[in-house]
Amino acid sequence: MIITVGGLPGTGTTTTSKLLSEKYGLNHVCAGFIFRDMAKEMNMTLQEFSSYAETNTEVDNEIDRRQVEAAQSGDLILEGRLAGWILKRSDIKPDLSIWLKADPMVRCIRISERENENVDLALEKMISREASEKKRYKEIYNIEIDDLSIYDLTIESSKWDAKGVFNIIEKAIDNLKA
């Protein structure tokens, strides 16, 4: 089974992906972790690496390559803002493609708690990062990140806690057509 989980920062994609991975015994591959690892390898902050990635397409190409390679082996949770799009463009059909969304201030508060920084700083970083990513996705892939047409399931994650979001997805998985 291949499941993609996408969403903007602070929507709960990592928490949800980990819960799904544990429940269904699937490998969890996260584009964000790949991106963070690459930033560390180049001794850059996430903001610096995001700016670098805007003009260096090899960053996105490497992330894409690793995602496709993982999906070709099957049986995984593929987490990333473009995970669903990358598989679609590689003619790999996930069993379920999910997009999580949440109110921007809810996301900002979640990020500030996760990163242990004040809300104003988290908001500033979040806005900068999302603008950078949106620009990159449009220029490199001609993808509008706001286009949710490829997703089977879209969940407003600020309405439920992590377990509630997981329960909705679990019901969807349990009711997939064979």
Swiss-Prot record:
Protein's name according to its UniProt entry? Cytidylate kinase
A cellular component term from Gene Ontology for this protein is: cytoplasm
Which family would the database say this protein is a member of?
Belongs to the cytidylate kinase family. Type 2 subfamily.
Q: Which CDD domains match?
A: CMPK (cd02020)
Where in the cell?
Answer: Cytoplasm
Task: Look up the record and give one Gene Ontology term from the biological process aspect.
Answer: pyrimidine nucleotide metabolic process
Q: Tell me, what's a Pfam family for it?
A: Cytidylate_kin2
- GO MF terms, alphabetically ordered: ATP binding; CMP kinase activity; dCMP kinase activity
Name the keywords, alphabetized.
Answer: ATP-binding, Cytoplasm, Kinase, Nucleotide-binding, Transferase
Q: Which Gene3D superfamilies match?
A: P-loop containing nucleotide triphosphate hydrolases
- EC number, as in UniProt: 2.7.4.25
Protein species of origin:
Methanococcus maripaludis (strain DSM 14266 / JCM 13030 / NBRC 101832 / S2 / LL)
Keyword flag Transport: no
Reactions that this protein is recorded to catalyse? CMP + ATP = CDP + ADP; dCMP + ATP = dCDP + ADP
Q: Which annotated residues bind ATP?
A: 7-15
